[in-house]
Amino acid sequence: MSDISTTLAGIKLVNPFMVASGILDENGYTMKELLERGAAAVVTKSIGISERDGYPTPVIVEYGDSLINAVGLSNPGIENFGEEINIAKEAKRPIIGSVFAYNAEEFTKLSVKMEEYGVDAIELNLSCPHVKGFGLEVGSDPDLVEDIVNEIKSKVKVPVFAKLSPNVSNIIEIAKAAEKADAYVLINTVKAMAIDIYSRSPVLSNLYGGLSGPAIKPVGIRYVYEVKKETGKEIIGVGGISNYKDAIEYIMAGASAVQIGTALYKYGKGIFREMEWQLRTFMDEERFEKIEEMVGVAIKR
């Protein structure tokens, strides 16, 4: 039988399926449940220095099988999040702490605190497309990205993942600026908009949001392929993964693991068990013994 476990920056995962940072992992009990129902690891909601309410409703628009969201980085603040991590850790699987800030100093404070809370790795949200002063505004500046990653790597011992944006002119330049990160997370959501044709106005209270789900999968596949080919660094693929075939595409493009978000919102928390046996069946039929044998095979041809 094929081995569907994988290793990411030295972290052993029982399968390649992780929970993406987003709207379904706000508290410890939800994260624990997702892990107990088959997720190999979970990435927390992005956490900042202080509590943030986010945007007023509406903050989510269904767009076919995809979503446009502008939640606004709502979170309880780092000082109030430790207990949620403690609860999630009861599942005995890796927890990745996602953090956002506007400069290297704050990113570092958050990362150090996450490490103190016992996370297994840190994911730097350098790419949220809809909050002024954070995310994309930080992640589109290669000098700032380099400063942030380098400073954090000098202060923490756990692996650091840099989540990069598709909403930049040269993602390779940004990836190289973050080269000291232990892995890249590709991609964050695509900046998007929806109009209500009857009210003649944007649907989201923030006007713009981030598009996620199947609509962005080809974009994510492209960037994983290009960044893996250019850098050779470990990559976590994210964007539009709804089934095992989507996950395999990302893996063959160069990802060592994948993250799932919108599909959980659409299809429920049971998706992981189904994808596990489907992946194992595919690997048996195609005679792949290990996940690593599939990583980047499309690049090698």
From Swiss-Prot:
Organism: Thermoplasma volcanium (strain ATCC 51530 / DSM 4299 / JCM 9571 / NBRC 15438 / GSS1)
Cofactor entry: FMN
CC annotations in GO: cytoplasm
Family statement drawn from the similarity comment of this UniProt entry: Belongs to the dihydroorotate dehydrogenase family. Type 1 subfamily.
Subcellular location: Cytoplasm
Biological-process GO terms, alphabetical: 'de novo' pyrimidine nucleobase biosynthetic process; 'de novo' UMP biosynthetic process; thymine catabolic process; uracil catabolic process
Alphabetized NCBIfam families for the sequence: PRK07259.1, pyrD_sub1_fam
Name this polypeptide is given: Dihydroorotate dehydrogenase B (NAD(+)), catalytic subunit
